[in-house]
Amino acid sequence: MNLIENKIFDSERALYNIVDTRVKGCTFAGEADGESVLKETRDVLIEDCSFSLRYPIWHAKKYELKNSKLDEKTRAALWYSDDGIIENTEIKGVKALRECRNTIVRNCDIDSPEFGWKTDNTTITDSTIVSEYIFLDAKNIEIDHLDFKGKYSFQYVDGLVIKNSDLDTKDAFWHSKNVTVTDSVVKGEYLAWFSEGLTLIRCKIIGTQPLCYCKDLKLIDCEMQDCDLSFEYSDVQADVKGHIDSVKNPKSGSITADSIGELIYEDSIMECRAEVKTRSQTDK
């Protein structure tokens, strides 16, 4: 493997199309403000580097990005790249990952609006992410131990598994398909409207008007805090521990909780015939 070490690059396409190369301790910044410094690379290991230029890693194949920093000026850092590992790296630029395939993210700190759009086969573990519109229209995502904050998350995704995570969000999972969330906290209003095939297992759900207009919705051993006007027009099978503030116009299926503050049937635009019961009724 070739070695490029302790250099400073600021020109356009400075390391364009390098192959089988280790790039170590380099700085990508300067007056020339060049774009696309590592475009079209193959089999490249990038470690202990800092970036302050736009569009650095586009159309890369079989790359590793480790122990590096990409600041706010590093816009759209990784686009159209395949088979990548991003590890122990800080990413701060907008639109950091887009239309990439087969990406592994480990132990990273990411603050990037519009992160992960239209990606396929992404794995994230032990990371912190702040992002508006994360993973829009992405597919085949696996997440474990993620601390996430941001609005409009995981909309239009297809094929998502989340475990052991804390999601502080709003309008999450809208129009999503085939999503499973396990042992996680999901906080935020208007959760998962218009979703299909969403399963929540041992989760804590916090926020107003969750889980409306859903198809094939399942809640297994979940808690619901500050959840009013829940399940409107949803096809749902829900087993909830504790209290639900209110349930409104559930379309079909079954909802069971320890207690329900209010069951509302009014102003319905369709037949709503879901079975709603408390645990005491079930035990009789």
Predicted feature residues:
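Long, distal/terminal scaffolding or interaction modules
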Residues: M1-K284
